Amino acid sequence: MLSNSMQRCCQLLAAAILASGLYACGGSGGGSASTASVKGDTVHGKELYATCEGCHKLAENSVGPMHCGLFGRPAGTVPGFEYSEAMKASGIVWDAQKLDEFLVSPIAYVNGTKMGFAGFESATDRADVIAYLQHANKDPALCPAK
């Protein structure tokens, strides 16, 4: 059983993933889901992401994999992180839409994932976390080039 803080962390991450997906599905403009920016509140997203930091870090692996380089990356491929077979075999390539879908209920989206997060019910919270992750991934101070 995961602690409440780890469950909340997973919920916040899931919310971020889901929020990205919602924007990609309903956004305007012709950008693809992997490159379109989510119209979320990055300040609120950063606050929500603080809870995720019990399991995840932006630029390094922890209990969960790092989030720098998340968008456009195939699931289960961060070097040095031990993923579940289910995640490695999922075929997911992370973009805002996939992240949003995943964050609704990670366990249901990837049956067999190690991520013990119930998910984010709030589409707004998901969008905000995803917007923050997109912002962070473009900021070399947060996600330095390797």
What are these regions (language model features)?
Residues 2-14:
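Bacterial N-terminal signal peptides that target proteins for export
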Residues 9-11, 26, 53-56, 144:
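Secreted/luminal cysteine- and crosslink-motif detector
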Residues 16-19:
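Short, linear, compositionally biased motifs with a strong N-terminal bias
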Residues 21-24:
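C-terminal motif of bacterial Sec signal peptides marking the signal peptidase cleavage site
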Residues 26-48, 144-146:
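Electrostatic cytochrome c docking/interface patches
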Residues 42-46, 57, 61-95, 116-117:
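Gly/Gly-Pro-rich "capping" loops immediately C-terminal to redox-active cysteine motifs
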Residues 45, 49-58, 129, 133:
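The canonical Cys-X-X-Cys-His
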Residues 95-144:
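C-terminal capping alpha-helices of c-type cytochrome domains
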